[in-house]
Amino acid sequence: AALQKDEVLPITINLGTHMAVNIAATYRAPLGLNELSIAGGMAGEAVRLMTGETSDVPCIADAEIVLEGEILPIGWSKPEGRFGEFTRLMGGLHWNPHVRIKSISTRKDPMYYALHMPWEVILPGAANREAAVRRAFMLANLDLVDVNITPGGSCYFHAVVSIRKRPGEAKHAIMAALISSDIKHVVVVNEDIDVFNGDDVEWALAT
């Protein structure tokens, strides 16, 4: 909306937050659901917010570093990259918005938290993929036993699920997992298979 109106969009960039905030940030929440509410639920207390120095846009009060700025209304015009990605590959060149920084605030002796790809990103993100699969199975009334969003699939693209199977439900289980997030491949096994044991899963596929 700001771009269409040719207006700047005030933002805050919060670095060094509680891990619950980092995990919630990787979750694709539906419209109307605030990721900070999810973070507060995981942390057991509300995420403390405060107003920035240059605008009314809130920032996380306990962040190590807060950058306040504004997205300029010039579209995706700044080349950025290449960077290491969660897939353990180098990403391509991307065009991103231009952010003008207006203020930098820090805690006393702040710690700068920089990601080291991929594990710091994909392992916390696996919890969100698993939660999405579990919710899809619950809505589909499928008797789910366990879920493994596999590290080999970058904790994002592959799922192994075990179910207490009733006739015809294996196909429904596959469809439920596929529509839950960005999962590409799904393996469904019986409840006696350990989804975290690659040999068990391969044996189930072979037999």
Predicted features and spans:
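Internal mixed beta-strand/loop scaffold within catalytic domains of large alpha/beta enzymes
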Residues: A1-N14
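Charged, compositionally biased interaction regions
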Residues: T17-T207
